[in-house]
């Protein structure tokens, strides 16, 4: 290979790698070893991850549906993906932190629903933050709810950006913001959960700032 061309290729590669660092961000597409799943039947193809489950399975797991976690820690950053659900059931974006060496809830976004397990509301989006209670293993839960509905059977581009005490949630052309001091805590893993039915996801990216 011509030496000048070789040097140009190396220089271009170094530029592509260096630019994100100069801008203070690292873009990560989670690998298989950074991904885990609880419950549900998984199939993958053409860049789409499909997780299927039934109401019977949901009830057998103490009313918990399938969840996929991405183990990419960050303090400031963005979790983004596109998703599609075949039922009018809530889809939950989950962020976990660590307390005393154990995973602990940090932040949740309930799309088409609320944290209440028996709720059938599908015209709201709910944001849940958690505050530690001194001397207790339990946490104080704060819920903020707004009117919103994501259409069934359609792809929805979604992202959650955490920066200091601010969470910015974008779903298609809608943007929501939540402030809470607890959001300053480090995320050890984030993911997506649904009750039952088929949830498809693609284009999962985590950007660390």
Where are these regions (language model features)?
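Extracellular carbohydrate-recognition regions
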Residues: 24-43
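Short, aromatic/His-centered strand-loop micro-motif at the edge of beta-sheets
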Residues: 133-157
């Amino acid at each position: 290979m011509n030496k000048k061309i070789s040097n140009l290729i190396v220089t271009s590669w170094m530029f592509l790698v260096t630019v994100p660092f100069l801008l203070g961000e690292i873009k990560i597409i989670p690998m298989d070893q950074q991904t885990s799943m609880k419950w549900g039947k998984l199939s993958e193809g053409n860049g789409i991850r499909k997780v299927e489950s039934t109401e019977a399975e949901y009830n057998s797991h103490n009313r918990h549906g399938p969840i996929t976690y991405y183990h990419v820690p960050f303090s400031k950053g963005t979790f983004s993906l596109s998703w599609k659900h075949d039922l009018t059931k809530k889809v939950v974006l989950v962020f976990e932190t660590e307390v005393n060496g154990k995973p602990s809830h940090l932040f949740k976004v309930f799309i088409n629903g609320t944290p209440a397990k028996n709720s059938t509301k599908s015209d709201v989006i709910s944001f849940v933050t958690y505050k530690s209670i001194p001397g207790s293993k339990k946490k104080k839960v704060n819920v903020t709810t707004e009117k919103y509905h994501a259409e069934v059977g359609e792809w929805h581009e979604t992202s959650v950006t955490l920066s200091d005490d601010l969470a910015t949630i974008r779903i298609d052309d809608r943007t929501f913001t939540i402030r809470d001091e607890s959001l300053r805590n480090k995320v050890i893993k984030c993911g997506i959960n649904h009750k039952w039915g088929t949830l498809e996801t693609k284009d999962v990216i985590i950007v660390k700032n």
